[in-house]
UniProtKB/Swiss-Prot annotation:
Name listed for the protein in its UniProt record: Probable endonuclease LCL3
PROSITE patterns: TNASE_3
Originating species: Laccaria bicolor (strain S238N-H82 / ATCC MYA-4686) (Bicoloured deceiver)
Family: Belongs to the LCL3 family.
Transmembrane segments: 41-63
E.C. code: 3.1.-.-
Keyword terms of this UniProt record: Calcium, Endonuclease, Hydrolase, Membrane, Metal-binding, Mitochondrion, Nuclease, Transmembrane, Transmembrane helix
SUPFAM superfamilies on file: Staphylococcal nuclease
Amino acid sequence: MVWLPGINDLNRDKNNTNNDKDPNNDLFQDLKTRLDSLPTSAIAIASFATGAVTAVFITTFHVRYGRRLKNGEWITPDFLGRNSWIKGVVTSVGDADNFRLYHTPALGGYTWPFKFRTIPSLSKDLKDQTLHIRLAGVDAPEAAHFGKPAQPYAAESLAWLRETLLGKKVYCQLIRRDQYSRIVAHVHLRPRILPSSLFRGRNVSLELLKAGWGTIYEQAGAEYAKGRKDEYIRIEAEAKFVTKIINSLLPIILNRAARRGIWKHGKSAETPAEYKRRYAG
């Protein structure tokens, strides 16, 4: 006689098959039961904590990558203490060792493919919208101001910095605030080939020394790129003496070679620091 399975046997086999297909079913049911057993107040607290953590994360992310620093008052001591990096476009160069920067945060709408904002070009639109940046570690010839005459080569030094920076994107590591409320910073140009998100371009302070349009700043509060003061000294020395060496070795180019920048008439040229001391009284 052939045995035929009953309905109960079929249901039992079906249940066994379902359990075989979902080995985590018991664990899921256990977790669901535990969650359902939690008091409403505990669930509310957990939801609030999750929301608070999310809000803090979003706010921190926005402050770091999306909020624009409109002027120096937006830069807090904590921000300077971290020696944070920012990027922006130079909108004006009024002196040979400082300039105005329009901050363009990474997620602020100033960079493709998310570009939907433009940088103002009119002076009235830039009022109170820029950071006053001072180049770290260097000093350039003083322009005429407060009744004092201009230092020799002040105009040439200013022209060099304008040619180097004006209208260009730069990266600034913010160091401190000086006595004139300017932000002292290590300033770098954009790299020519490599991605700017991973690499920095040329250090503008070192380029100023190399061109011969400034000296090392050695007064109180001097700041140099980490571990590179010797490089500042070396580059300044090269700017002073390189042409003298060339002229001594290659007289044929004597008429074309000239000392660099402020060292044109020799290393005895008055430095910006000496100029300031002379007019301090």
